[in-house]
Curated annotation (Swiss-Prot):
A single Gene Ontology CC term: small ribosomal subunit
PROSITE patterns, alphabetized: RIBOSOMAL_S4, S4
Protein name (database record): Small ribosomal subunit protein uS4
A single GO molecular function term of this UniProt record: rRNA binding
Domain of life, per lineage: Archaea
Amino acid sequence: MGDPRKPRKKWEGPKHPWIKERLERERELMGRYGLRNKKELWKAETLARRFRHRARSLLGLPPEVRREASRVLVESLYRMGLIDNPNVDIDEVLGINAEKVLERRLQTIVYKKGLAKTIYQARQLVVHGHIAIAGRRVTSPGYLVSREEEKLIDYAPGSPFKERAEEAAQA
């Protein structure tokens, strides 16, 4: 069974809570991506920060070790869809920000694919179980969708939205 792992917080809040520019930027991002609360935004910022930190730590390694480790990191980020090209330098990883992470959320991709009319409807469709990835129902709007899974997103089997879409396609 092994040792139980130590649970960690998945997010880190801002160091100073009342900076006007940051508050305005956060409100704008929450509206654009249909986030329910700032914690969801802070999770994305923390994830992006961790990737940037890993990339910075690779820069201090010897060249032969850095080459292999950076290739693994870049391929992983490419599969996640956070970078556009698998053959980029480690400097590209330093450009990852919270918006790139928010673009990969299931809620955002459902909206961008046109399965929902608004970003808020996209969240509701996901939470209510109307969206599936490769036939498996996913009810977490914050699920990070990989490049391979992005093509497999559709309405869930048995969803009334799927039936309506099929009827509209036949008509």
